[in-house]
Swiss-Prot record:
Histone methyltransferase that specifically trimethylates 'Lys-9' of histone H3. H3 'Lys-9' trimethylation represents a specific tag for epigenetic transcriptional repression by recruiting HP1 (CBX1, CBX3 and/or CBX5) proteins to methylated histones. Mainly functions in euchromatin regions, thereby playing a central role in the silencing of euchromatic genes. H3 'Lys-9' trimethylation is coordinated with DNA methylation. Plays a role in promoter hypermethylation and transcriptional silencing of tumor suppressor genes (TSGs) or other tumor-related genes. It comes from Danio rerio. In the pre-SET domain, Cys residues bind 3 zinc ions that are arranged in a triangular cluster; some of these Cys residues contribute to the binding of two zinc ions within the cluster. The keyword Zinc applies. Keywords: Chromatin regulator, Chromosome, Metal-binding, Methyltransferase, Nucleus, Repeat, Repressor, S-adenosyl-L-methionine, Transcription, Transcription regulation, Transferase, Zinc. GO terms for biological process: DNA methylation-dependent constitutive heterochromatin formation; heterochromatin organization; methylation; negative regulation of gene expression. This is Histone-lysine N-methyltransferase SETDB1-A. Residues 938-1009 form the MBD domain. Zn(2+) 4 binds at C1371, C1424, C1426, C1431. Zn(2+) 2 binds at C1077, C1091, C1129, C1133. Residues 633-697, 724-780 form the Tudor domain. Zn(2+) 1 binds at C1077, C1079, C1083, C1089. Residues 177-190, 474-500, 807-831 have a biased composition (Low complexity).
Amino acid sequence: MSREKDDENLLRMTKDDLQRWIQAEVERNPHLMQRREQLAQVEEWVKQKERDSTCTRLLYSNACESVLECESVMKGLYALLGLDYRDEDSEEEGGGGQPHDVIQIADDEAERRGNVICNGEDDDNDDLVVIDLGATKETLEPMLEKVTVAIQKSSKLVQDLVQMVSKTSMGATSPLSTSSSDINRPSSSSTPEIVRPESVTPKLEITNSITIVKTESLSSVPKISSLFNSSEQCKSIADHDSYFKPTIKTEPEWTPLTPWEDSESSPFEKLIKTESQSTDVTPSVMTPNKQPELLSFQSTTKIKPEPQSTQANTELSSPPSNSKLLENHNSLSIAAIKNESQLKASVSEVDLLESDSEQSDNAATKTRFKPSEVTASSKLKSSGDHNSASASLNRTDPKVRPVTPSGTPPPSKSPPAVDNTASVETNQTDSELPTETPVEESTLPSNPKEAVIMSDAESTDKTEKPQTRKKSSKPSVTTTSPESRLTSSKSPPVTKTSSTQKETARAQSPSDSIDESADMEDSPDEPSNSPTESPTKTPDKTTRNDAPAKPSKAKKSSKHSSSESSKTLKEIKLKVGAAVLGKKRHNHWSRGTVQEVETEDDGNTYKVEFKKGKTIVLSANHVAAYKPPSLKDLYIGCRVVASAKSENGKSLYNAGVMVELPERKNRMRFLVFFDDGLATYLALPDLYFVCKQTKKVWREIKDESSRKQVKDYLQVYPNPIAVVLRLGQETKAVRNGQFEDCTVLQLDGSLVQICYKNDKQKEWIYKGSDKLEHILTIKNRHKQHSHKKHHSPEGKTQSSQPKTLHSSKSASTSTSSANVSPVSSDSVSPARVTRQSDKTKTSISPQKIMSPAFQPKVVLQKISLPSSISPAARVSNSNTNSSLISAKRPAPDEEEDEYFSEDEVEVLEQEQNKSVYLHQRCCPACLEEVRPHQVDIHHGKNPLLIPLLFKFRRMTARRRIDGKLFFHIFYRSPCGRSLCDMQEVQDYLFETRCDFLFLEMFCMDPFVLVNRARPPSTTTGQPHLYLPDISEGKEVMPVPCVNEVDNTLAPNVTYTKDRVPARGVFINTSSDFMVGCDCTDGCRDRSKCACHKLTIEATSLCTGGPVDVSAGYTHKRLPTSLPTGVYECNPLCRCDPRMCSNRLVQHGMQLRLELFMTQHKGWGIRCKDDVPKGTFVCVFTGKIVNEDKMNEDDTMSGNEYLANLDFIEGVEKLKEGYESEAYCSDTEVESSKKTITMKTGPLLKNSLYKEDSSSGEEPMEVDTAKDKVKVHDKPLGERKLPNKPHETPKDTQKKISELRKNDGQESSGPKRCFAIKSFQRRVKPLESTEAQKEKTKTPKNTRGLFNDEDACYIIDARQEGNLGRYINHSCSPNLFVQNVFVDTHDLRFPWVAFFASKRIKAGTELTWDYNYEVGSVEGKVLLCCCGSLRCTGRLL
């Protein structure tokens, strides 16, 4: 019994309870819980493996680059020797070995091995760092073998090449050590001297594969001076005999590597691993001579071995081919220790500019260098330049960081050797090397022989901050490249460091926190804190020399450099001949070509040639590369140049700031704020990236309103202020300093197009622009709120502070600010801001948001507006001095006007015609990501829900007008476009060629829900009957059958979705007898569609006025019934059936309907989802028979399923002057018709029906003797309706047959024995009864034209039919009947379709008015049980 009880309780569970119970049981399943844990572990393991794989691939890539660098070095050596590089050794060169093919390594195994050698060289090293990246031995061994073979071949080639160099340079008299480096100097002699090394250090021949990796990429090659001139002969070679060999014992530290340049050939830089215990530094002194000659001197490197690897740095410099006589000499290069994991590349590319070589004769610069002492963390570097500063002539790869010691060369017994025309670049230190020590400067050389003798004009620069003058190498510490990989986190700790090194390490470490707000907003980037920095620039802007600075300033300079380095963004390097966009004037950019590149302290400058040969020197932030940038380089706040069309259609270039990246909301476009105040959406090909980016990009904007808008946007990003506007909405906007009334015309993402009412001028503006009244109101109130909250006496001192920000009420231009009174809290003193800066950025409270002042359609999400403070007040208390406060932002491009002569000045369209935003139409690509492979992928779902499943968003908005709250619906497409009405939805579907979504799937009624929960069932148990689909798949949507009342089975009826002609009935469906259209726009233009014209012209038959041009479907819905019928497009039409707006009924039933058993009316139909007004529901089908044959049929059972095709008769009544008397609408009241007063005893005891509950026909036979029925002819208003609708007892219910008056017959004539439902509305006469009788006697000629027929056709749904046969009657129905012509234009056979006459909630029964005439059947009464307030109580 208990089990049966449990089963019974289980059966009584509702669907939701059952789902919850099943979910709970599933959650408690131990196997499921265990499986979830396992899946979580597997997912975490997969993520870890992905991270490991990414790291491994990165190491592989770096190793591959090292191998390629080694190959480029060898090619460079061959090029210097005038030989051709080959993949195998030549027999003439004595190679005799196996071919050494260069293998292109796909995976980067070498870098992983290279990291190991950086941490230690010997096997017994205790400080060896091993990193486990999760890669298995099996996956790494194959790649390791390939890398090892390639590196062995490359190493062999290097050794052979060194030997060959030794053979070919026998003319040198001074032997060189392998650790010495030859620095090529420009010589006045055309004779290049080839210096050969004595021998190759045996340490190069290392068998360990890991060591070979390092040896190949960092092998030592002495620098060879190969300076050839095509028009001069070689000079004799002379060498220097003086040898100075001090022994320097260095500690194991990371010695920064000094970059060097090469010209006209592949650059290279080699570092040799040595293990000698001491370093012998042998400088040489070059004596100036009228006859230029080469000075060679030897240096021996001895370095104490430590866990770090030690390499010798070499330099190579080659002058231009057209330069004058050059002098070469050799200088020593101390071994440098390079960490491979920190230095990404050890080779710098060199580009020698021809224009620079021509300037080599102009500038004469001489720098006196003090002898420097090589310490543990610094390397003595001597870089030779010719008289035009070869450092500025050469370019290094932007990816390679020049690494030099911080500060300047220290005192040493071995000074650098410099020729009489060289400008030696000082050493640099990377701000990211904390172990480097600033070296001090000595005033006198320690040895007279070490004195550096120079000629030409002497120019000594003593700078605290060394600056490198390389063309394309990264600037010194102040301009650190983001690509530099020099980090000290992986370097081994150094235990033996001096106190000076420790202090430098602290000074050079990056700042813990860099406050962007600490810098002045409208002032230029502050220079270095070092007062001794005084770079000297030559007249030709190609050479700038720096001399060592004093050690007392080293720490401060290093710290400042580190701070500046972390702020500097990546700068794009351009080459000569590159096409660019340059800033010619304010808000005007033009195309040009780079003619010359110059390196400055704060970045490169470019000499750009524009049209007509006009040349301007521009900084990097005023030049943009003329090629589309990559998406990964773009970010919010970056500076770009974009092309936009003016009002006259000309393309103009202007700079702007990017504020939106592509996303679904903006339809995958970029939003750019132009400097002239306009905003527009652009695609990637229309953008050009500015070469040099700045943190505070608004400084580049001159216009105050535009600068303020960009600044405010970036400060509150990603939560900017936005205002929600609708199409046609009235608002106010600022123009010329005053508010003007305007109307919203278009919406596009974050932009809105407004039209001013005064002159009808249109303008696209940003939704958060200060031009809008709502935005200004919100910002102004927030400022006032912040001012009151943080009010203090210090705020009164604001009058003495220069005003930098305008009030939120001010106009969009600076010239109009005088028209509006500013708010008193616009600017405050620095002291006040310093103490309250953390309090002013407060979010608006929810109470304030809900206040009436914040109601007008403004959406605020996590808004945190900064208070309006002066830029000078954003520095700390320690920095709020007069110098910082008074610092002003320099006016950019003040000198550019000098390049324009008066006769060349043109009228710039950019200044006269601002860029106009062009609205971009949608295309099929907008739905490409959601377009399904199968059209009916969501078959069986609610049609209104399907767009949401394809990433559309149905959003409800509200607005308060005159104290009343209004709601409206708008859709947001997957590409971000807002669709605010059905017309926009229709246009969007047509523009995107959407063949899987249709117009009837969208609804703008805010009270129609797409996912409304169905009302709970009245029964708790399982239904007595449930069939999943009574249509057996014939309908588009399945039609389930549910019986929760009794055990009545489903009707045994043949289901047919189409009408079936009976024997003897012929329906001509040939297209030859129909009219078709030739529309290609989806039949949206009613005036051109022939089918629409048929529907419109038919309305002329109705009395009361001209034709109704709006007749027919409106956005796939029929708002009201058309007695004259609707003509849909047919197969003869050329329009696309999927996109046509005049095809609806022919597509079949689209709603989710359900057949269910009512309580008292038999079977009925209800909807499972909300149905909007005018929606097509279904058709009424069955067998089409003739009325005459129906009269002959004596076996009339179930005649309540008969319907009359009386379309012709209904229209003829309209033609005769009848007026519609339909009372389907809830607001219509019949003023005069026959009313029924029923006095039946048993009926008074019946219960009350609920309002709008479905009713059905309950025919019964009534004895007129016992139950008196009185019929009164009086107006409806005079009759008192019964308080309670009555229910007929089942024992008295019996279906009866009722007669309906034939058309044209009088009421006293013969009557039928059955009743037929009419699809035409009842009409009332406007004329007298006599006149009506005369007209009714007039014969009907229209039907007689069809073979003299005089009777209507009837749809017999007794044995076969569809859902329409189950729809019950109601005196207040929610459906109306419409005659539709689809497959034939024969007026006798229209399709009978049901449409929703009002909004229908989910779970409501669908009903329609049968149009029975009371008293049409003699002696028989049919009671109405619809339960409506307007229920007449009787059908017949």
